[in-house]
Design a protein with these regions (language model features):
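Conserved NTP-donor binding/palm subdomain of two-metal-ion nucleotidyltransferases/polymerases, i.e.
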Residues: 1-102, 107-182
């Protein structure tokens, strides 16, 4: 039985995996072209998928640029920080530009009150919760500024997790990577 490419596209779209799956299709075409000849993707679907993959690539370039700019801005204001989750995780992909980007999560060193005050000095009405505060959308990219990278609902486990973050923060705040082609 052949691959139902439309079904794969629908699944990949729902799971935010269009870019990654398109990378696989490109590899399939290079490494096993006879498979694609036996079970071809329709031209219209292929063009749609290719277009989505390019949109994902461009969005990654934009989010990388915003993350780098935000990181530099916070450092200039004397705040140590690191990018969490999304764009940092993308570096683990064979092609970081194939991951569908979302918002930027950035961990800023310091007490929650200090970080909240800093963000509210820029945008007074931002909402804060236990582990992060919203930051004004920057060039169309949503940003969350974390004073705690994450949390657990069980207070005993959460205390242990926060102690762990305290132990590793020096390593995290001093780690540098390149996002994109900067």
């Amino acid at each position: 039985a052949g691959m139902d490419w439309q079904e794969l596209y629908s699944f990949a779209s729902k799971q935010a995996l269009l870019g990654l799956c398109f990378e696989g299709i490109e590899r399939l075409g290079k490494e096993y072209p006879e498979e694609l000849r036996r079970n071809p993707i329709g031209r219209e679907l292929l063009m749609t998928w290719m277009g989505k993959a390019q949109q994902i690539r461009r969005q990654n370039m934009k989010v990388n640029a915003v993350a780098s700019k935000l990181f530099a801005m916070l450092r200039e204001d004397g705040m140590r920080c690191c990018i969490l989750k999304g764009q940092g995780n993308a570096l683990m992909y064979p092609n970081p530009y194939s991951r569908t980007p979302g918002d930027i999560d950035i961990w800023v060193e310091g007490e929650d009150k200090r970080v909240i005050s800093f963000v509210r000095s820029i945008s007074p009405h931002e909402k804060a919760c236990y582990h992060h505060i919203e930051f004004p959308s920057y060039k169309g990219v949503e940003v969350e500024v974390h004073y705690r990278p994450s949390f657990l609902l069980c207070s005993w486990h959460d205390r242990k997790l926060q102690k762990y973050y305290e132990r590793v923060k020096e390593q995290q705040f001093s780690h540098r990577v390149m996002l994109g082609e900067q």
